[in-house]
Swiss-Prot record:
This is ELMO domain-containing protein A. Disruption phenotype: Null mutants show the remarkable ability to engulf multiple particles simultaneously, also positively respond to a cAMP gradient but form spurious peudopods which are normally suppressed to promote efficient movement up a chemical gradient. One of its GO terms (biological process) is negative regulation of actin filament polymerization. Functions as a negative regulator of actin polymerization. Modulates actin/myosin II at cortex actinomyosins to prevent excessive F-actin polymerization around the cell periphery, thereby maintaining proper cell shape during phagocytosis and chemotaxis. GO terms for molecular function: myosin II binding. Residues 383-561 form the ELMO domain. Pfam families: ELMO_CED12, FH3_FHOD1-3. Associates with mhcA. Residues 792-899 are annotated as: Disordered. It comes from Dictyostelium discoideum (Social amoeba). Residues 792-838, 852-897 have a biased composition (Low complexity).
Length: 977
């Protein structure tokens, strides 16, 4: 809720992100905006003068005035707010200042006493309401809900209703239907109170079961779009919470209805899937409660989908059961949910409940593996047989398998001639992991298999070892088979089991690593397999040592996961470090971690670029991969920031002004980036950007107009049509102000080219009959019906603007100039009129802007429009100038090498604007950053991110909270201590 607050002569706009329920807290908050500590000595008033004694008086857009109680008596009667605040005075009262003060002071005291009495009366009424029968109390509430005057107060009271008997009476009297029917009409705090009231009512299980299918469908249909309410996070949060309550307490039939409503209504209206909307809420919202409720709803939908069989629906609805479960998770992967959750995991502070929901989602992902593990290998299945043949062809390409049951399988490391007997423990999942390793790391997998021949009597069965690794990862390391930690093993319909809701989240096996890759388990499996093979040689293992070596590898993986790595790179780094430590520190020169090298070189003042070049030229693939990832993240962050600046727009001054045919100087250019998709999507890759610009006419020494006052009429060009040629290095201009930045750009725009090619000479412009002449006896009102003429030489300009959808209608006539007595013949050929207020009225959408003129007498006998504008001290809001001829003060503005480019020299006093503008164009064009400021930012961010990454990989914990500042010593004279 957004309100305007005034204290003395200061005005501040404040936005309440959460619902307000306590007047004292609101007063304290608003007083703190003006650094008022003794807020209890102040009161809030509306702009009408009414004292704010009820929180319901504050609504969206309210204007609040803060007044000191002791100073209200000094306000004279009849001024400002005294009539409303103090009341009407006696006409016979003395008029002296002292008596006026006393009268007002007494009235203030009386009004305060009246407020106390009103509060006491309200308390008595509440006590009386408690004594009323439930029927009477609920009837009063329902009547107030239907009355616009008391509706907001009724919702506010209803959300605090806690007695179960009253809730039952409210439901029996169709109270839910009364609320649902009004949701579409409610806004602001009233809507927030209504949703909170629904949340209170639906927290009782009997309310869900008592709802009809019509009420259920109507409620869900209205709640779904409310979850996207970004202007009021409280509405979005409560709507998501209501959907969670509904699904948690519903039976399977209602969930089918929910899914049907979700697919058939919301998706058709919005042309997108609601699951995608929920995933976007995980990243687009800055409110933790919204992110938490969105993830909770996702978990509930996943759990309900697994336990419910939903008939197939049209338009791509999700079916229930295991197939629907797998399909839903695959769909969430397509919406990049893992990237969103990874950012939540990497947050500075993760709330315990949010961490719990992250764990529950992780268990859902584990369930996919469990389902696959429970599939027994069937030798009669053609699908399973095809998977087995795929493993053979990946391991021995070009080698023909003699038969389905063959001794050749023992070469791969199976125990017998029929591999299906080895998959009993882990089902088809054991085969899936072997295929993943052989397919994605074929060379390494084949090397491990073929190396068993060289080991002779020291070999180990490769395929069998891989199946054992799958078993250990599933049961001992990731604990996927632990029943009491599985969210599905709950007697209730809630997807969060009783165990997970009571167990400390820090005691649960939570692995942030799984949010970094869609196949995180398989990637960990491949890494572990390679560690097993290298450890086998390091320990000179034999088949008799298999269990001992496997136990050592398992402990190594568990130790690496204890540090909670968030990426696979960090996990690999931890494993390598633990492997070297377990081997006794051999090859010490190679064991120095790159992070220690980098940090020590930083301490010695070495160059970042040289260090990064050394690391990137290293033969270690993990370092190259790490640096590539950090570099991509830094560039993506810089690009997002630069694009954000460009979307707000830049205003630059023209080094040499352009002039219109009417001699109006154009001194400024406003240019911005525009997202043509209009979908508020922060993903730059999915945006279709264009560049918009317009010229402004203000005083030469005046600053440009503020961004918010610029109209939305722009010329639009492609990104490829704008060129930043670089900063000016003209040595001839020795008087350049060093505090200013000089640069030039080139614009490829047919409309601008047409305007420039049809320009009139500047020398003929002032004496041309096309200028509207004014003398000392002419006022703006006397020429309000006059129209600026456009000469016949500009027909092609008009045609060009018409082709660009400006819809300019001009009929060229001859204009007779004024003879000095103020009499001029009006001409009806223009798209700019002078209205009754003496202001220019736009009828077109040209990118040329001039400020409105103020009514004032000209100082000379013959003044052009340009002269009158120059006498205006401060430019007011701009209006549009139609179909002007542009005149550059330098003929070199057009590039001689490319006649289609129009080059403009610009000046800026803000160096940051120039660098942000420059870098934005380069990054959007797929080029490298060129400005020195941009390069400095890039190097700084790259340095910080690389250092943090390496510190994390090296096991150095970085505190997430700012350390406390030590207490100052009592004695600073340390020599006497």
């Amino acid at each position: 809720m957004k309100i305007k607050v005034t204290f003395q002569e200061r005005i501040i706009e404040h936005n309440f992100e959460t619902e307000i329920t306590n007047l004292q807290q609101v007063t304290q908050k608003l007083c703190s905006l003006f650094l008022i500590t003794n807020y209890y000595s102040y009161s809030l008033f509306l702009s009408s003068g009414q004292l704010v004694d009820n929180i319901n008086l504050i609504d969206e857009g309210s204007e609040i005035i803060i007044k000191h109680l002791n100073r209200l008596g000094t306000i004279s009667i009849g001024s400002g707010y005294s009539n409303s605040v103090v009341g009407t005075t006696n006409n016979n009262a003395p008029s002296s200042p002292s008596s006026s003060i006393n009268i007002n002071g007494q009235q203030i005291q009386q009004q305060i006493q009246q407020q106390i009495q009103q509060q006491q009366q309200q308390q008595q009424q509440q006590q009386q309401q408690v004594q009323l029968s439930p029927d009477t109390l609920i009837n009063n509430l329902l009547n107030n809900l239907k009355d616009n005057t008391f509706k907001k107060k009724a919702f506010f009271d209803l959300k605090d209703l806690k007695e179960e008997i009253l809730i039952k009476k409210f439901v029996e009297k169709n109270g839910i239907e009364v609320i649902v029917c009004q949701l579409k009409e409610l806004t602001g705090n009233t809507l927030s109170y209504a949703l909170s009231a629904l949340q209170t009512i639906m927290s009782y299980e009997f309310t869900i079961t008592s709802m009809t299918s019509t009420d259920t469908a109507s409620l869900i249909t209205q709640l779904l779009p409310l979850t996207e309410n970004t202007s009021n996070p409280s509405i979005s949060k409560t709507s998501l919470s209501l959907l969670c309550l509904f699904l948690n307490q519903s039976n399977n039939l209602n969930f089918k209805q929910f899914s049907s409503t979700l697919v058939l209504e919301y998706n058709e209206k919005t042309k997108r899937n609601y699951n995608h909307t929920l995933v976007q809420l995980l990243s687009s919202s800055n409110t933790v409660d919204v992110q938490l409720n969105a993830l909770t709803l996702i978990n509930i939908i996943i759990g309900k989908t697994m336990s419910t069989t939903i008939p197939g629906l049209e338009n791509g609805s999700v079916t229930g059961g295991e197939n629907g479960f797998n399909k839903l998770l695959k769909e969430l992967d397509e919406y990049e949910i893992n990237q969103k959750l990874k950012k939540l995991v990497e947050s500075i502070i993760v709330a315990p409940e949010l961490k719990r929901q992250l764990y529950i989602y992780q268990r859902h992902r584990f369930q996919v593996i469990t389902n696959r593990k429970n599939v027994t290998f069937n030798k009669e299945s053609s699908e399973h047989d095809a998977l087995l043949m795929k493993l053979w062809s990946l391991t021995y390409p070009g080698v023909k398998l003699e038969s389905r049951v063959s001794e050749q399988w023992k070469q791969m490391g199976f125990q017998g001639t029929d591999p299906c007997t080895d998959f009993r423990a882990m089902g088809i999942w054991g085969l899936d992991n072997l295929i993943y390793f052989a397919q994605n790391y074929n060379e390494k997998f084949r090397k491990i298999v073929n190396s068993q021949i060289d080991r002779k009597e020291r070999e180990y069965p490769t395929a069998t070892a891989g199946i054992v690794l799958t078993f250990e990862l599933y049961n001992s390391i990731f604990k996927m088979g632990t029943p009491n930690l599985n969210p599905y093993n709950s007697t209730t319909s809630n997807t969060t089991s009783n165990t997970t809701s009571t167990t400390n989240i820090d005691d649960l096996p939570f692995f942030p690593l799984f949010f970094s890759h869609p196949h995180a388990f398989e990637e960990v499996y491949c890494t572990t397999f390679q560690i097993l093979d290298s450890t086998w040689d390091d320990m000179n293992g034999t088949y008799m040592h298999f269990q001992k070596i496997m136990s050592s590898v398992k402990n190594l993986i568990i130790t690496a996961l204890e540090s909670k790595p968030t990426t696979l790179e960090a996990f690999d780094w931890k494993c390598q470090k633990n492997t070297k430590n377990s081997n006794g520190g051999t090859n010490s020169n190679q064991n120095n971690s790159s992070s220690n090298l980098l940090l020590s070189n930083f301490a010695n003042g070495s160059s970042l670029l040289s260090l990064l070049n050394d690391l990137s030229s290293s033969s270690r693939d993990d370092m190259k991969k790490l640096l590539t990832g950090v570099n991509y993240q830094v560039l993506d962050l810089i690009k997002s920031q630069k694009i954000s600046y460009f979307q707000e727009g830049f205003q630059f001054k023209l080094h040499k002004q352009l002039k219109t045919k009417q001699s109006l100087p154009l001194n400024w250019i406003f240019i911005r980036l525009f997202n043509n998709n209009n979908n508020n999507n922060n993903n730059n890759e999915n945006c279709s950007y264009e560049i918009q610009y317009c010229f402004l006419s203000t005083e030469l020494n005046q600053p440009p107009l503020p961004n918010q006052s610029i109209p939305t009429n722009y010329n639009t060009i492609k990104i490829s049509d704008l060129f930043f040629n670089g900063e000016s290095t003209n040595s001839n201009n020795k008087k350049k102000d060093k505090s200013l930045s000089y640069f030039n750009i080139s614009i490829k725009d047919e409309q601008i080219q047409s305007l420039i090619q049809n320009q009139l000479p500047l020398s003929n412009l002032n004496n041309s009959s096309n200028s509207l002449q004014l003398d000392s006896s002419t006022s703006m009102n006397s020429i309000k019906d006059s129209i600026i003429n456009i000469s016949s030489s500009n027909n092609n300009i008009k045609d060009n603007l018409t082709n660009n959808n400006t819809n300019t209608n001009t009929n060229n006539t001859n204009n007779n100039t004024s003879n000095g007595n103020g009499n001029s013949n009006s001409v009806s050929m223009s798209s700019i009129n002078i209205n009754n207020s003496g202001q220019l009225s736009p009828n077109t959408t040209s990118p040329i802007l001039i400020p409105q003129q103020q009514q004032q007498q000209p100082q000379s006998s013959s003044l052009s429009v340009q002269h009158q504008q120059s006498s205006t001290p401060t430019p007011s809001s701009p209006v549009l100038l139609s179909s002007p001829s542009l005149q550059s003060s330098s003929s070199s503005s057009s590039s001689s090498s490319n006649p289609n480019l129009f080059t403009i020299d610009l000046i800026s006093s803000n160096r940051d604007d120039v660098s942000n503008f420059w870098d934005s164009i380069k990054l959007l064009s797929g080029q490298e950053i060129k400005s020195q400021e941009g390069l400095d930012d890039y190097h700084s961010l790259l340095s910080i991110n690389t250092s943090v990454k390496l510190l994390d990989l090296d096991g150095i914990d970085i505190p997430k909270e700012t350390p406390q500042i030590p207490i100052l010593p009592d004695n600073f004279d340390f020599r006497t201590v």
